[in-house]
Amino acid sequence: MSSVIERFLRYAAIDTQSNEESQTTPSTGKQLNLARLLEQELKELGLQDARIQEGYVYGTLPANSTKAIPAIGFIAHMDTSPDFSGTDVKAQLVENYDGQDILLNPEHNLVLSPADFPELLDYIGKTLITTDGTTLLGADDKAGIAEIMTAIAYLTAHPEIEHGTICVAFTPDEEIGRGADQFDVAGFGADFAYTVDGGSIGELEYENFNAAKAIVKVKGRNVHPGNAKNKMINSILLANEYIVKLPPQETPATTEGYEGFYHLNDIRGDVEETTLYYIIRDFAEDSFAKRKETMLNLAEECNKKYGSGHFHVEITDQYKNMKEKIQPVMHIVDKAQKAMETVGVKPLIKPIRGGTDGSRLSFMGLPTPNLFTGGHNYHGRYEFIPTFAMEKSVEVILKIIELYAEEHSN
């Protein structure tokens, strides 16, 4: 078993699920279990400044060259999504995949099928890592952590490879949008960085959604149902009216590429009050602004029908499209593309239909595009990752480092 696979399996077994309702940093104490392990492993690899700061793990591999090679950062996040259990992950290796259904869990008859996930057929003959069907896998983003750590281990074992300063960081709470909240850009010390938090092999991303969350509070009036005629106002039914007035063709399930959406991801309520939790996503700034305006205007429209105060919308921006911060330093994307091509990986440059720590870090002065990890179907029981893609990710990281050293050696 290659070292990147061994590392990933160890990291995946540690529960690091984040919690959006917590106000601490990190949002869950269990993320520190992985943080402490990574700090220790970085120190064992010779990164003597390895440290945990505000729940973030930082470390620096000093340059072994006197040339003016830029300091390059590599970043991954420790937490897993709160959308699905990350407790007691039991990863399974499927060797020499034959293109058929994979039985994840005989007891619950859970199957990972190419009929549902046709991308599986791209990996016939390869080794896959899957879940046992009861948890997510955590390749998002423990695969990225394993790939960065393996690359650092390779560099420390091969001091003959010339490189500049290499900065690594592992962040908490990326899955709940707080991964960059306490990130110490100045202390990190990189001129630019890459998050290793993408999907399938070859993905290279420097555009992402503009993102906001919207909380819609709907007020009703509860009265005993036995004498409720012309008195009761059921907030659940009012909330449903709001939901169905948003464009049904503009949801995650009906959009792709550069198309934006409204996503209702939680509802909590009763007759007296119902709360709708939305996320709003779009690539273009004008379209993004229009979506926010649509939600506010819809609340006004509903209030005109039912009376002032029944509907209230609160919108909070979360992150912006990093494209405007990456374009002035496109050499970092070009170098990653060349690195992939050099190691035999076809680059797939595409927009991120989501966000990474890099999107916010780019606006904090650290331009940070995103590299693939190799994983698929994040945030659920059908998550999987081909082992060869993880190995290629390590090669790409090392090649980026090598290319910058070569460029500044001439």
From Swiss-Prot:
Pfam families: M20_dimer, Peptidase_M20. Its main location: cytoplasm. This is Peptidase T. InterPro entries: ArgE/DapE_CS (IPR001261), Bact_exopeptidase_dim_dom (IPR036264), Peptidase_M20 (IPR002933), Peptidase_M20_dimer (IPR011650), Peptidase_M20B (IPR010161). It is an enzyme of class 3 (hydrolase). It comes from the Bacteria. Belongs to the peptidase M20B family. One of its GO terms (cellular component) is cytosol. The keyword Protease applies. Zn(2+) 1 binds at residues 77, 140, 197. Its EC number is 3.4.11.4. The active site is at 79, 174 (proton acceptor). GO terms for biological process: peptide catabolic process; proteolysis. GO terms for molecular function: metallopeptidase activity; tripeptide aminopeptidase activity; zinc ion binding. Keywords: Aminopeptidase, Cytoplasm, Hydrolase, Metal-binding, Metalloprotease, Protease, Zinc. It is found in: Cytoplasm. Binds 2 Zn(2+) ions per subunit. It catalyses: Release of the N-terminal residue from a tripeptide. Zn(2+) 2 binds at residues 140, 175, 379.
